[in-house]
């Protein structure tokens, strides 16, 4: 890589039509260099490739994940002139009360002049992340201004799905989506044509068809995962941007179907569970799993003697949701060195060349984080090639599935916990689906308008 002097030369790009800052006390850039190289008003400054970086950044988060600390250490090792200080609220497990107190501490910091330069926005309430609060920069501006950032190197559909009104306030480090396999002992007898994607309506219809031929202890999903994934998938479709429309016949219909399916659900782990690709008898309709490379990857996209091919779980609006994995990187509007902050975010999601045998001993982090962000296509291909031992056919299918994802699942921790409590009452038939939908509407409207 070429060197461009001690501080490096920045490339400046004028962003037309930027909104005036609603940001709280946003500061201009204070990078080293001449005046015309600084971030001035509507100019977005980025470093040229190979520049020597120097400066200090602060990284704020509730928890520091091992993979993030790993990236911080790698970045400082690669750029000795850079120091990244972490501002972490918790360093271990906490109670719900402590969590809420810590979150309030983080929100108070965000509204002050003591806020960090970069944040992991994963745990922040949705209105802080998405309602134009002015807390965070639109990272699309930096992507567009940086000649060294190529969207084709990333799953751009994920970046687009994470946008709010065309603005990218957070970049997810990685993502996963949900797939399911149906029990072929049931689908073969029904002569059921297995689709590529299914939503709640498809599953409900198949369940009704299967009941007459199924075993007496028939249940939809032995591990109850479907009752977690379906609401997460569907809620996203009814809470878009600042619009809330839970109070609709369509959502009440979704709840009615969920409620009916739930009544047939047996106790957790009633049936023996061994392999997502294997069914015994006709007591279970499906197994759910994520796209993560876990367990045996042999034949992961093929049908087996007792299980169908993987089927993507979608919402009723036809979109394939993704869930974030790892961090959601955000640049504070008060960041004091935005060009340097962008270099760090870009580094965290960029291509990495890792020695697989030197991976973290923890299999979870070894598989999904040690090799860099799965948002980067080449990182994913490296991992797939390693896990699948150059199984090109499976790797191509993996790529095709990743490219189909089009929607970010609604999952705000605070609101999600409120809605879950209400939904549980509906599932237990303490309230009707219509009452549940109305309560959802009231609580969600209050929440997004706070």
PLM features per residue range, with description:
Residues 38, 42, 121-177, 305-314:
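Hinge/lid segment of periplasmic solute-binding proteins
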Residues 81-153, 189-190, 284-285, 302:
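Extracytoplasmic "Venus flytrap"/periplasmic binding protein-like
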Residues 51, 66, 327-412:
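Mature extracytoplasmic/periplasmic domains
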Residues 143-146, 158-227, 231, 237-269, ...:
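Helix-loop-helix "hinge/cap" segment bordering the ligand-binding cleft or interdomain interface
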Residues 23-26:
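C-terminal motif of bacterial Sec signal peptides marking the signal peptidase cleavage site
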Residues 323, 381-450:
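C-terminal capping/gating helix-and-loop segments adjacent to ligand/active sites or protein-protein/ligand interfaces
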Residues 69, 253-343:
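Extracytoplasmic/periplasmic substrate-binding proteins
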Residues 40-65, 71, 82-89, 118:
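Short, well-ordered beta-strand elements
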């Amino acid at each position: 890589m070429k060197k461009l002097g001690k501080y490096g030369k920045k490339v400046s790009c004028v962003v037309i039509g930027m909104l005036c800052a609603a940001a709280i006390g946003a500061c201009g850039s204070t990078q080293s260099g001449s005046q015309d190289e600084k971030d001035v008003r509507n100019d977005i400054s980025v470093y040229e490739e190979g520049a020597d970086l120097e400066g200090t950044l602060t990284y704020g988060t509730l928890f520091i994940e091992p993979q993030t600390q790993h990236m911080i250490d790698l970045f400082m090792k690669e750029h000795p002139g850079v120091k990244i200080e972490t501002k972490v609220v918790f360093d271990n497990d906490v109670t719900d009360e402590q969590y809420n107190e810590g979150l309030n501490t983080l929100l108070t910091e965000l509204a002050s002049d003591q806020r960090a330069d970069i944040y992991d926005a994963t745990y922040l309430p949705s209105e802080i992340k998405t309602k134009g609060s002015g807390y965070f920069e639109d990272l699309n501006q930096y992507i567009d201004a940086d000649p060294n950032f190529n969207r084709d190197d990333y799953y751009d559909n994920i970046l687009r799905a994470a946008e709010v009104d065309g603005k990218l306030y957070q970049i997810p480090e990685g993502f996963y989506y949900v797939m399911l396999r149906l029990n072929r002992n049931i689908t073969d007898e029904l002569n059921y044509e297995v689709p590529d994607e299914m939503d709640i309506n498809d599953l409900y219809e198949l369940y009704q068809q299967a009941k007459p031929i199924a075993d007496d202890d028939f249940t939809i999903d032995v591990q109850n995962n479907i009752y977690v994934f379906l609401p997460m998938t569907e809620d996203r479709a009814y809470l878009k941007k600042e619009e809330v429309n839970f109070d609709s016949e369509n959502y009440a219909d979704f709840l009615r179907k969920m409620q009916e399916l739930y009544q047939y659900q047996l106790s957790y782990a009633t049936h023996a569970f061994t392999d997502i690709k294997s069914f015994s008898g006709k007591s279970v309709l499906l197994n759910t799993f994520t796209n993560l490379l876990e367990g045996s990857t042999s034949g992961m996209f093929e049908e087996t003697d007792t299980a169908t091919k993987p089927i993507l779980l979608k919402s009723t609006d036809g979109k394939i949701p993704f869930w974030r994995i790892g961090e959601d990187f955000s640049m504070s509007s008060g960041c004091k060195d935005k060009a340097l902050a962008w270099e760090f975010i870009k580094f965290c999601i960029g291509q990495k060349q890792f020695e697989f045998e030197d991976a973290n001993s923890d299999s979870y982090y070894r598989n999904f984080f040690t090799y860099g962000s799965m948002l980067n296509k080449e990182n994913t291909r490296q991992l797939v090639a390693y896990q699948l031992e150059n199984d090109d056919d499976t790797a191509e299918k993996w790529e095709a599935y990743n490219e189909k994802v089009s929607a970010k699942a609604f999952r705000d921790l605070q609101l999600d916990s409120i809605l879950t409590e209400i939904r549980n009452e509906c599932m237990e038939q303490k309230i009707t689906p219509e009452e549940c939908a109305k309560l959802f509407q009231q609580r969600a409207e209050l929440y997004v308008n706070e």
